[in-house]
Every structure is written in C-alpha cells, then in structure tokens.
C-alpha cells in the first residue's frame, strides 16, 4: 500500500469543447480562477488558497479525455505505484511520462475499468532539448 499521507487527489482534468464557456461556468459556479497554461490547449483553475488541500483543476480539449473527468492522485514514487496497480489487477494505460520542471504522470485502469491518473512531484525533470520555460 502506498503512503496514505501522500495519496491524495491533487489534479483532475475536465474535458471541454469550448474553453471560454467552460471557464466561465466553473468561475461562476465555484469562483475558480481560470488561466491559460503554456502554448498548448490547456487551462488551469485555482480551486483554493495554497498550501491548502485543494486540487488543481484543468480544462483540456475533449479529444484528450474522451471518457470524462480524469482524477490524478499524488504518489511518492510513481514507479512503485504503477507496480502496485499491476499487482492489484489494474492495467497501465500510459506509462511514466515527464512533465518538465514539474514531475511525472501516468494513467491506469482499475479493476472496474475506470481511468485514473498518477502524479509524482519532481521539479528536476528536465526540459527536452535543455530549453527553459517561460
């Protein structure tokens, strides 16, 4: 079993068709601040004051998450977590992937077929080609 103190929901993605409409909806309903993140079609929403227990929410093109909301759970060691997924009867869908200067992510399906994301914080993940973030 992974450490209970670090296995909390830290991020989830909501598939969208219209970022302005979706951002306005969540801003109106929950008061979340919406901001475009980087050069890709990706928007983040702040759900609470740091360092509170709130999760980060993102709006992502529907094509990238056709099944609906995707919840990410923070783990201490993503490799160990993926091993635990397999040992418990789950299936790894997307193996360990880098998020430069942020950490690592992966996705799996549990025994009931639900898609769940994993996230490990690691600010040392390099930027491809040695570039810098803006």
Regions found by a protein language model. Give the residues of each.
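A short linear hydrophobic-aromatic micro-motif
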Residues: 33, 57-58, 92-95
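Core segments of cupin and vicinal oxygen chelate
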Residues: 3-6, 13-54
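Short, charged/polar, Gly/Pro-enriched secondary-structure boundary elements
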Residues: 51-58, 113-116
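Mid-chain, well-packed structural core segment of small domains
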Residues: 64-94
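Short acidic/glycine-enriched loop/turn segments that link adjacent beta-strands
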Residues: 39-42, 65-67, 99-104
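Short, flexible, solvent-exposed loop/turn segments with mixed acidic/basic and small polar residues
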Residues: 2-3, 58-63
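Short amphipathic alpha-helical segments
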Residues: 8-12, 55, 67-71
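Vicinal oxygen chelate
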Residues: 2-4, 10, 14, 82-83, ...
């Amino acid at each position: 079993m992974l450490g209970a103190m670090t296995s909390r929901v830290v991020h989830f993605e909501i598939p969208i068709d219209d970022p302005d409409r979706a951002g306005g909806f969540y801003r109106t309903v929950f008061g979340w601040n919406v901001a475009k993140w980087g050069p890709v079609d990706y928007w983040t929403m702040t759900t609470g004051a740091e360092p509170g227990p709130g999760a980060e929410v993102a709006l992502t093109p529907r094509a990238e998450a056709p099944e609906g909301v995707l919840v990410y759970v923070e783990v201490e060691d993503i490799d160990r977590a993926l091993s635990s997924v397999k040992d418990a009867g789950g299936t790894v869908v997307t193996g360990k992937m880098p998020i430069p200067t942020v950490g690592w992510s992966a996705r799996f399906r549990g025994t009931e077929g639900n898609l769940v994301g994993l996230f490990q914080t690691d600010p040392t993940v390099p930027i491809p080609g040695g570039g810098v973030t803006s």
